[in-house]
Amino acid sequence: MESLKDIRDNIKSVQSTQQVMVTMKMISSARIKKAQNAMLNARPFSLGLEGVIDDLRKDILDENNSFKDPDLSKFFKKPDMEKKNIGVLFITADKGLAGAFNALLLRAALNFIKENQDKNIYFFIIGKKGRDFLSRLKQPNVHIVYDAVGIFPKVGYVHADILGEEIINNFLKLDLCEVRVLYNDFKSMGSQKLENQRLIPFDFEIAQGHTEFGEEEHGFLFEPGKEMIFKLLLYRHIKAGLYRILLESQAAELAARMNAMDSASKNAGEIIDTLKVKLNKVRQSSITNEITEIVGAVEALNK
């Protein structure tokens, strides 16, 4: 049977752990409000830019419905799955203690690798958990071309800008059939959804009707030229989409950690209650034994 000291030490240890969990929950709760605001503020810009790009695209396509710059056409063609090179943006957390947040992503990445054994997979990794996992795999067809850690929970557009440059340059240089993105999307405080989406080339023609320019001619003068402006805006659109994805992943991670710490804190409370009951039982048993010994000693003296 455990001694009273052992049980008291266990209670103190669990209480200390519970306090850490409560603190982590409070930190995540405070940060997620900022993350949600940043996420909501990023969406209108991305949608507005989408409409402007669509208007320009219709203006610069030639009679064959193609661009003068062959690189631009690659962003709108259907993926040629006969190509042997494919890219994946893989977004995980830097730390654990976030429930199944990382485990689901790592399993999805492993399944993706198994399903594409015949391809060279070029990974763009955000997050220490993903980088460490893929580095340990040592698969001959898995190549890490870019990784960044420590950007969460303070994601800025500069991170999306750097990431976007890497993805765009390697998409063209390595002749990737497509670039997909694996990440957890924020749905609500209690729900995050694992996403496996195509980033580029675009799944569909850029949506119409999001811009005030409409169909009529407004007589705008473009310098240094429509196609150059279109290319700059297209790259900016990709980076804006990446920024939104990073913000979504950040919010999902914070929500998952907050829920995990809340659950762990409640479990710690239940363990403490159980230990306190056990402590009382041991104390009562100890007192009973002492009383029995005293009574026995008194009876022995009276004989």
UniProtKB/Swiss-Prot annotation:
Q: Which domain of life is it from?
A: Bacteria
UniProt keyword Aminoacyl-tRNA synthetase, yes or no: no
Q: Which UniProt keywords apply?
A: ATP synthesis, Cell inner membrane, Cell membrane, CF(1), Hydrogen ion transport, Ion transport, Membrane, Transport
The topology of this chain with respect to the membrane is: Peripheral membrane protein
Entry-linked SUPFAM superfamilies? ATP synthase (F1-ATPase), gamma subunit (SSF52943)
* Gene Ontology molecular functions: ATP binding; proton-transporting ATP synthase activity, rotational mechanism
Spell out the subcellular localization from the entry.
Cell inner membrane
Asked if the record carries the keyword Lipoprotein, the reply is: no
User: From the record, what ranges are coiled-coil?
Assistant: none
Assembly, in brief, is: F-type ATPases have 2 components, CF(1) - the catalytic core - and CF(0) - the membrane proton channel. CF(1) has five subunits: alpha(3), beta(3), gamma(1), delta(1), epsilon(1). CF(0) has three main subunits: a, b and c.
Chain's role: Produces ATP from ADP in the presence of a proton gradient across the membrane. The gamma chain is believed to be important in regulating ATPase activity and the flow of protons through the CF(0) complex.
- Protein family per UniProt: Belongs to the ATPase gamma chain family.
Name of the protein in its database record: ATP synthase gamma chain
> What organism is recorded for this protein?
Elusimicrobium minutum (strain Pei191)
